[in-house]
């Protein structure tokens, strides 16, 4: 059973306090910034990813970046960041989970938890038993931008359609494309909902 009414999020620390805690690990500022980019990118790309899988991806793409202890220490502090993700365990999301081990916590895109956790639950259900697409390091880190979309022939064709057929250009095209991209990525979107963007 989910904690629909009240989720107690970890306390948010100031940037100064966060930096001081990261240095206690000790992590260089560049290392903590890179890990933060990884976490944001994974939240944007996957929506939800367990820390043990995030660790596996970071270790495969940046093998000498951190040790397992440093990764866990970073994740514990990062729970107190104000970023595009939460790091929460089942014990914080559900009433029937007593304790979540640190590596079982999940990096969760902030858009999946609002007044309810229905989007989170729906996303988690849709991910079951599916493999993770893991791009190379450069491409994964591009997902740090929540509106990043890989350049594909389909993206080019859609943008051309929006320009030529819908008469969109400049900022209006960018806004419409971002809205459409967000709608497509949302697990709760329907075909009708996505197509309604073309009526605007």
Which residues fall in each region the model found?
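Positively charged, polyanion-binding regions of nucleic-acid-associated proteins
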Residues: 23-50
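Short coil/loop linkers at secondary-structure junctions
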Residues: 49, 64-65, 169
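Extended alpha-helical interaction scaffolds used for oligomerization/partner binding
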Residues: 130-200
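Charged low-complexity interaction tracts in eukaryotic proteins
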Residues: 4-24, 30, 73-135
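Non-catalytic, well-ordered alpha-helical scaffold segments
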Residues: 33-37, 52, 69-72, 156, ...
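Charge-enriched amphipathic alpha-helical scaffolds
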Residues: 59-95, 99, 187-200
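A short acidic, leucine-rich amphipathic alpha-helix
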Residues: 53-58
């Amino acid at each position: 059973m989910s904690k629909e009414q009240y989720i107690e999020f970890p306390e948010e620390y100031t940037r100064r306090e966060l930096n001081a805690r990261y240095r206690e690990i000790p992590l260089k500022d560049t290392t903590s910034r890179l890990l933060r980019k990884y976490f944001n990118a994974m939240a944007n790309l996957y929506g939800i990813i367990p820390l043990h899988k995030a660790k596996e991806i970071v270790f495969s793409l940046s093998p000498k970046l951190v040790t397992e202890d440093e990764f866990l220490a970073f994740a514990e502090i990062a729970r107190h960041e104000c970023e595009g993700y939460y790091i929460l365990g089942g014990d914080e999301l559900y009433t029937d989970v007593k304790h979540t081990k640190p590596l079982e916590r999940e990096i969760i895109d902030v858009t999946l938890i609002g007044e309810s956790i229905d989007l989170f639950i729906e996303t988690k259900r849709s991910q079951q038993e599916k493999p993770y697409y893991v791009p190379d390091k450069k491409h994964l880190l591009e997902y740090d931008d929540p509106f990043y979309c890989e350049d594909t022939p389909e993206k080019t064709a859609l943008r051309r359609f929006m320009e030529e057929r819908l008469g969109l250009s400049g900022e209006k095209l960018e806004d419409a494309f971002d809205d459409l991209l967000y709608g497509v990525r949302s697990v709760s979107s329907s075909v009708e909902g996505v197509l309604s963007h073309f009526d605007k």
